[in-house]
């Protein structure tokens, strides 16, 4: 058997959080850098994470009547100018195709930064009657935004996402859709990713370009910074009026449709890493992990060990994503590698344990080991996974709650902000929000539906109108 040292050491999280994060992404083989700056290669293990998110969300959206479609990567530049707020929001980072070969294109093509324009143009041609409504479309695709600063999964010039675009007859139906999707995203975090989200309405400054109302799901990373993990927008009739999307109602009256758009992206993978992982590498919740179980024979040349390992693999692979490692490498090397890759459950099978008809199981999230009867293992895995998932969620929730404070003075706000995490404060409006951003670097994450903390805004001394949750964010 080959003796190999583990060479993929991960930077300590406490010494350099940014380097630690990059190490985990690269050394757990989630991504690789490409030759084009700001564009990453999704390696099999990283892409499998995204596929598992896709499967979960697709299943939910199919039950709610949504249909998957695919729209083109590009659209003519002239369409970009139809919705003025939208173009102001996305023009700075929009990439365009201007030439083909040595010829200039007669009309520039915008590479989609998001697809409201494409969907609205299509809907304007196909919706005429109330019988055509609602339209509940979703697409899985890539988008391109020319970001200045990039970070794997969190911010890139190209990223993967799903974007839903729905059309409704009334404001009430569209708002119901907007909030329903927000609930779906929150449950995706809790039930698949073991991620607690703070959900709420965005301020006017932070809302989506072209939307009337934006809601978001916000996660708190281990370093105390927030991450916007998904959004759901009520677009009202803004795009409908710009693109003339009208329908005739049952009373033969012409009306503008009400639209929504919403999406989550590969940012969810970044959140998974930053919330759950540790100095040994990736830590993954069992339901989303590409490899849920790894079986490691401690003496693979021993017939009994090998046979037991293969039998157990045969049983478990019917219900789980399981891998049997028969590589000619030391058990210690294998342990380190699968800990680095965050595999939730490791099963160690050795001669000594088999004398008592036992195997050893190792849980990645808390490093707990225990012996268990071989015959009992398959029936106990569902409960093990449920316990692992719930404990990971509770740990993340505890971190969120312990790093959520409220301030009654601006100085108190600044002190809390330096400690990291969320800080709630009642403010007078956009003037206070922009001053806070300029002076502290904190941004408004969501508006809280709670009572005012103070009657006056600690920043402007004007009457407080709303309580907002602030944080420094990715």
Swiss-Prot record:
Any one GO molecular function term: proline-tRNA ligase activity
Main EC class the enzyme belongs to: ligase
Catalysed reaction, written as an equation: tRNA(Pro) + L-proline + ATP = L-prolyl-tRNA(Pro) + AMP + diphosphate
Highest taxon in the source lineage: Bacteria
UniProt keyword annotations, A-Z: Aminoacyl-tRNA synthetase, ATP-binding, Cytoplasm, Ligase, Nucleotide-binding, Protein biosynthesis
Any Pfam family: ProRS-C_1
GO cellular component labels: aminoacyl-tRNA synthetase multienzyme complex; cytoplasm
Classification via SUPFAM superfamilies: C-terminal domain of ProRS (SSF64586), Class II aaRS ABD-related (SSF52954), Class II aaRS and biotin synthetases (SSF55681)
EC assignment: 6.1.1.15
Listed InterPro entries: aa-tRNA-synt_IIb, aa-tRNA-synth_II, aa-tRNA-synth_II/BPL/LPL, Anticodon-bd, Anticodon-bd_dom_sf, Pro-tRNA-ligase_IIa, Pro-tRNA-ligase_IIa_arc-type, Pro-tRNA_ligase_II_C
Annotated compartments: Cytoplasm
Any GO BP annotation: prolyl-tRNA aminoacylation
Subunit structure: Homodimer.
Family as reported in the entry's similarity comment: Belongs to the class-II aminoacyl-tRNA synthetase family. ProS type 3 subfamily.
Domain notes per entry: Consists of three domains: the N-terminal catalytic domain, the anticodon-binding domain and the C-terminal extension.
Role this protein plays: Catalyzes the attachment of proline to tRNA(Pro) in a two-step reaction: proline is first activated by ATP to form Pro-AMP and then transferred to the acceptor end of tRNA(Pro).
Protein name: Proline--tRNA ligase
Taxon lineage: Bacteria, Bacillati, Mycoplasmatota, Mollicutes, Acholeplasmatales
Encoding gene, per UniProt annotation: proS
């Amino acid at each position: 058997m080959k003796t190999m040292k583990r060479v993929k050491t991960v930077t300590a999280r406490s010494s350099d959080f940014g380097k630690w994060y990059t190490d985990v992404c690269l050394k757990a083989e989630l991504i690789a850098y490409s030759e084009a700056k700001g564009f990453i290669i999704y390696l099999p293990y990283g892409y499998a994470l995204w596929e598992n998110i896709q499967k979960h969300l697709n299943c939910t959206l199919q039950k709610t009547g949504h249909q998957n479609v695919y729209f083109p990567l590009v659209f003519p530049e002239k369409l970009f100018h139809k919705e003025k707020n939208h173009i102001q929001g996305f023009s700075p980072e929009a990439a365009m195709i201007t030439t083909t070969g040595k010829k200039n294109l007669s009309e520039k093509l915008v590479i989609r930064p998001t697809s409201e324009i494409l969907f609205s143009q299509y809907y304007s041609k196909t919706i005429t009657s109330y019988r055509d409504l609602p339209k509940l479309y979703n697409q899985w695709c890539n988008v391109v935004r020319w970001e200045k600063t990039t970070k794997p999964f969190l911010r890139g010039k190209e990223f993967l996402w799903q974007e839903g675009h729905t059309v409704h007859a009334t404001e009430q139906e569209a708002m119901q859709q907007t909030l329903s999707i927000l609930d779906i995203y929150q449950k995706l975090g809790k039930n698949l990713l073991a991620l607690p989200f703070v959900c709420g309405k965005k301020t006017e400054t932070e809302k989506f370009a072209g939307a009337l109302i934006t809601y978001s799901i916000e996660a708190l990373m281990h370093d105390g910074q927030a991450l916007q993990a998904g959004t759901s927008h009520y677009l009202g009739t803004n795009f409908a009026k710009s693109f003339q999307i009208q329908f005739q109602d049952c009373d033969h009256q012409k009306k503008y449709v009400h639209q929504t758009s919403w999406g989550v992206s590969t940012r969810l993978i970044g959140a998974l890493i930053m919330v759950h992982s540790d100095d040994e590498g990736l830590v993954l919740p069992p339901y989303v992990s590409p490899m849920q179980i790894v079986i490691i024979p401690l003496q693979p040349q021993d017939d009994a060990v090998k046979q037991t390992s293969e039998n157990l693999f045969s049983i478990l692979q019917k219900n789980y994503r399981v891998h049997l490692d028969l590589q000619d490498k030391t058990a210690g090397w294998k342990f380190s590698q699968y800990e680095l890759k965050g595999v939730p459950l490791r099963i160690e099978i050795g001669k000594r344990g088999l004398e008592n008809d036992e195997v050893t199981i190792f849980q990645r999230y808390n490093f707990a080991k225990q012996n268990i009867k071989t015959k009992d293992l398959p029936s106990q895995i569902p409960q093990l996974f449920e316990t692992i998932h719930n404990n990971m969620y509770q740990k993340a929730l505890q971190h969120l709650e312990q790093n959520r404070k409220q301030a009654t003075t601006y100085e108190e706000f600044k002190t809390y902000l330096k400690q990291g995490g969320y800080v709630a404060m009642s403010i007078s409006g956009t003037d206070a929000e922009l001053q806070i951003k300029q002076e502290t670097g904190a941004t408004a994450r969501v508006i809280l539906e709670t009572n005012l903390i103070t009657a006056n805004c600690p920043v402007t001394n004007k009457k407080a109108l709303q309580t907002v949750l602030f944080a420094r964010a990715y």
